[in-house]
């Protein structure tokens, strides 16, 4: 055999091996990634609405944004489903509370800690938010940028 024939034979052998290789059985694996519109339950699990209905678990929030930016902390954002008493929003105390005024920062968590940690006066809203932590989620008052994300997702999550 000439060198050219050996090379051609090798190429044909590799091609035949690749073409004759097959899977035993195709398996579809379920998509378990968190998505916008998924339900966050009190045990910290997220699931599709259909799975939630069948689970018998208690919902606490709806996912409205998935973390795809470095400046966002956590895996994503979810909006709380239950109402907070209106008096918690009656906070016109006029005291500097070291919160950010940056309209583009995703710093709601930092701002909530600043409100909660103020020693001069207490923020009723921050106290109510910290009361929610019995479920293990890191609930906080959203920043302006986080509220914009929620606004843009309103048609998906409603």
Language model region names:
Residues 1-5:
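N-terminal secretory signal peptides that target proteins for export/translocation
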Residues 6-13:
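Sec-dependent signal peptide recognition
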Residues 156-158:
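Cytochrome P450 catalytic domain signature, combining two hallmark sequence patches
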Residues 19-22:
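C-terminal motif of bacterial Sec signal peptides marking the signal peptidase cleavage site
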Residues 26-139:
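Extracellular adhesion/carbohydrate-recognition regions
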Residues 136-154:
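Beta-edge loop/turn motif
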């Amino acid at each position: 055999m000439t060198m050219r024939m050996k090379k051609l034979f090798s190429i044909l052998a590799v091609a035949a091996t690749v073409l004759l290789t097959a899977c035993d059985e195709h398996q579809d694996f379920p998509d378990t990634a968190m998505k916008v519109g998924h339900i966050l339950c009190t045990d910290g699990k997220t699931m599709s609405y259909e799975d939630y209905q069948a689970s018998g678990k208690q919902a606490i929030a709806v996912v409205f944004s998935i973390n795809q930016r470095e400046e966002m902390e956590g895996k994503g954002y979810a909006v709380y489903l239950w109402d907070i008493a209106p008096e918690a929003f009656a906070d016109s105390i006029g005291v500097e509370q070291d919160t950010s005024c940056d309209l583009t920062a995703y710093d709601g968590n930092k701002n909530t800690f600043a409100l909660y940690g103020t020693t001069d006066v207490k923020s009723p809203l921050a106290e109510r938010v910290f009361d929610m932590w019995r479920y293990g989620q890191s609930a906080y008052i959203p920043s302006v940028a986080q509220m914009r994300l929620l606004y843009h997702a309103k048609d998906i999550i409603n």
